[in-house]
Amino acid sequence: MMIKNKKKLLFLCLLVILIATAYISFVTGTIKLSFNDLFTKFTTGSNEAVDSIIDLRLPRILIALMVGAMLAVSGALLQAALQNPLAEANIIGVSSGALIMRALCMLFIPQLYFYLPLLSFIGGLIPFLIIILLHSKFRFNAVSMILVGVALFVLLNGVLEILTQNPLMKIPQGLTMKIWSDVYILAVSALLGLILTLLLSPKLNLLNLDDIQARSIGFNIDRYRWLTGLLAVFLASATVAIVGQLAFLGIIVPHVVRKLVGGNYRVLIPFSTVIGAWLLLVADLLGRVIQPPLEIPANAILMIVGGPMLIYLICQSQRNRI
């Protein structure tokens, strides 16, 4: 009971930190806002300068929160579905497949803009299915599976590079220049995906069982692995439709959360949601304040942090095999 209460207290503290970071991100920038500016705006209702800043910063902050949460949860789900601690949507090519589909849809059927998360999901499924089919045939270990995923990532990024030579082929570049319609589109996918994940979370712990143990208790492990994998691909692909590829968030957060609160998915999913949202928000905030008025993409900061972590996890995986 004491441990459970400590986890609840930690979760509340993380929520407070997240809200405080969101406020700091909102008032920080080339044009700074004071508390008095916000107070005047919300009491009088008229302040054109504040209104313009709200329309520039608030969509960006909300999208950072949703994308961070979705990618962190997607990483946790992929690791559960594939039973691979190194799995992450960007590394195994899911994000690249989703981005190619997104780019093609915007070129040929731009009128379906509001359906981009769903269309990107179709593109993200292709590399995921290839990984599953190859794994079922060759039974890769954790590192070999990631190497196959990296090969798919390189292949699909090559295709994407060719496609983007067309000046009409536009792909999203991070969190900059986001508008309210982007928030609305992503919010639908975020709510749907995260609610389904919370409903599924009691079953996720059973994915650690082997096939014989699962069948002995009447648990259809293959069905839930597929459901978990598809949900992970959906969450990651929906973010790609709005912000493009963001690396390593799906690796960093689940491993940090496991160190903090253990591997119980009922606890891991909510904590991953909050910490993922906070981490991307911090990366975006740092990118805006390190060298103003220039902006460093949040993805660059995540790669600087995530690259060494991936190397560490690969070394740890190899050590465990010895």
From Swiss-Prot:
CDD domains: TM_ABC_iron-siderophores_like. One of its GO terms (biological process) is siderophore-dependent iron import into cell. The chain crosses the membrane at residues 9-29, 61-81, 89-109, 114-134, 143-163, 179-199, 233-253, 267-287, 294-314. Induction: Repressed by fur in the presence of iron. GO terms for molecular function: transmembrane transporter activity. Gene3D superfamilies: ABC transporter involved in vitamin B12 uptake, BtuC (1.10.3470.10). InterPro entries: ABC_BtuC-like (IPR037294), ABC_transptr_permease_BtuC (IPR000522). The keyword Ligase does not apply. It is a multi-pass membrane protein. One of its GO terms (cellular component) is plasma membrane. This is Probable heme-iron transport system permease protein IsdF. It comes from Staphylococcus aureus (strain N315). The lineage of its organism: Bacteria, Bacillati, Bacillota, Bacilli, Bacillales.
